[in-house]
């Protein structure tokens, strides 16, 4: 269990190419407490049966960190093509789904997860899985104070496939099926919750997955402020 000043994430990426094994990155971030981070990192390395291929430590101010994708760009360039003629950021075609976990995944759960990674790699298909630590300030807010329904989660999982814009439609349809299938594979270990910030159109019980027991209250608010559903999408909150 990390101190609340630290945040960590395990990022597993693979290209679906025989000559490139899946790559695991462990990221730890600290707001100003460098010595604490370094000590925790050393303690963690001592527990590993193997050593990392490479390590690096980077210091950023807050603004730089929030604009990481815009490193080396002027502000007019740090935009998408439809936002500025000078834009240099590019959109991607993405399929994404997610899970929340209230406890550590068992060995059987990890084997199930890695089995799916291996299968997709052998099929020549790329992808990524992010395991992101929660707790800390997230869990310190009472569950009924905001619409976010996953305050008790220990960590989240994000299942991702990212391709260039214009990627083959059948390839992206298959990617959407795979990321959603990961929820089925991990169902025995997860809470059943899902991360709202990118919706998964294949989640059937989306209102429960995104909002949990908050959905009815959100329906009441929707009915009060947007009864005609001016703001709407397929998995949007329906007014009470």
Question: Locations of the language-model features?
Answer:
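Soluble FAD-dependent oxygen oxidases
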Residues: 1-240
């Amino acid at each position: 269990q990390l101190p609340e000043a630290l945040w960590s994430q395990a990022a597993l990426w693979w290209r679906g190419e025989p000559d490139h094994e899946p790559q695991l990155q462990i990221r730890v971030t600290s707001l100003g407490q460098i010595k604490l981070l370094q000590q925790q990192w050393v303690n963690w390395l001592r527990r590993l049966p193997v050593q990392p291929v490479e390590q690096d430590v980077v210091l950023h101010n807050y603004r730089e960190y929030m604009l990481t994708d815009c490193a080396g760009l002027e502000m007019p360039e740090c935009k998408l093509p439809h936002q500025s003629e000078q834009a240099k950021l590019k959109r991607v075609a993405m399929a994404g789904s997610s899970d929340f976990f209230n406890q550590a995944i068992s060995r059987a759960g990890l084997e199930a997860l890695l089995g799916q990674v291996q299968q997709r790699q052998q099929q020549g298909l790329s992808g990524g899985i992010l395991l992101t630590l929660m707790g800390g300030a997230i869990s310190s807010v009472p569950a009924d104070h905001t619409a976010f329904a996953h305050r008790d989660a220990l960590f989240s999982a994000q299942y991702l496939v990212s391709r260039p814009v214009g990627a083959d439609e059948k390839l992206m349809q298959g990617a959407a099926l795979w990321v959603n299938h990961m929820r089925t594979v991990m169902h025995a270990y997860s809470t059943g919750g899902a991360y709202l910030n990118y919706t998964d159109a294949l989640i059937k019980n989306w209102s429960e997955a995104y909002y949990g027991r908050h959905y009815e209250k959100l329906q009441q608010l929707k009915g009060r402020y947007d009864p005609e559903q001016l703001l709407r999408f397929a998995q949007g909150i329906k007014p009470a």
